[in-house]
């Protein structure tokens, strides 16, 4: 998940450097969404893994 977030962030940075504002905004938005979903899934797995049998 974090790998995809970093990939979208790099795409956004490259697109912004080349002047593609719309594409950079879209890729940055996708990176934020993927990053937040990754953090939420990490926290859920962290707390679900601590259950005692």
Curated annotation (Swiss-Prot):
Gene Ontology cellular component annotations, sorted alphabetically: plasma membrane
Domain of life, source organism: Bacteria
Q: Where in the cell is it found?
A: Cell membrane
Task: Enumerate the UniProt keywords alphabetically.
Answer: Cell membrane, Membrane, Transmembrane, Transmembrane helix
User: Where is it predominantly found?
Assistant: membrane
Q: Which family does it belong to?
A: Belongs to the UPF0391 family.
What NCBIfam families does this protein's entry cite? PRK13682.1-4 (NF010229), PRK13682.1-5 (NF010230)
Q: What is this protein called?
A: UPF0391 membrane protein YtjA
What is the native source organism of this protein?
Escherichia coli O139:H28 (strain E24377A / ETEC)
Question: Gene name?
Answer: ytjA
């Amino acid at each position: 998940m974090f790998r995809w977030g970093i990939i979208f962030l790099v795409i956004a940075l490259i697109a912004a450097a080349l002047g593609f504002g719309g594409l950079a905004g879209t890729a940055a938005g996708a990176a934020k969404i993927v990053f937040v979903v990754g953090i939420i899934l990490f926290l859920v797995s962290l707390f679900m893994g601590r259950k005692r049998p």
